[in-house]
Amino acid sequence: MSWQTYVDEHLMCEIEGHHLSSAAIVGHDGAVWAQSTAFPQFKPEEMTNIIKDFDEPGFLAPIGLFLGPTKYMVIQGEPGAVIRGKKGSGGITVKKTGQALVIGIYDEPMTPGQCNMVVERLGDYLVKQGL
């Protein structure tokens, strides 16, 4: 299965009639493995800061999580495993695997819990596959 298939069929899938606004799988080096068409263009340092927060939990809390043109307020997550952010009625979930970051961005009517479920389910699967 290609990385694009994981994005198209597993991250952008429909959940209770809703789906993520955009999603991507990005290597720890910041290289995009696959992304949805609406995934924002980001700066290398934005991905570096996300990785740093996994290594140093709480790093992003005072400055926010930036991805492309959007700044997310970092909210509860799982230190070293999941970062969650909020912006208005939407937000972001980032799950770290051994080699990649699984990223999902949502807006209402999708809920934070639905986004977390979609992103973390694929992330957990990739971890079990050694990826």
UniProtKB/Swiss-Prot annotation:
SMART domains documented for this protein: PROF
GO annotation, biological process: nuclear migration; regulation of actin cytoskeleton organization
Name this protein carries in UniProt: Profilin-6
Subunit structure: Occurs in many kinds of cells as a complex with monomeric actin in a 1:1 ratio.
Species of origin: Zea mays
Chain span(s) of sequence motif Involved in PIP2 interaction: 81-97
PANTHER family named among the record's database cross-references: PROFILIN, PROFILIN-A
CC terms in the record's Gene Ontology section: cell cortex; cytoskeleton
PTM section of the record: Phosphorylated by MAP kinases.
Keywords for this protein: Actin-binding, Allergen, Cytoplasm, Cytoskeleton, Disulfide bond, Phosphoprotein
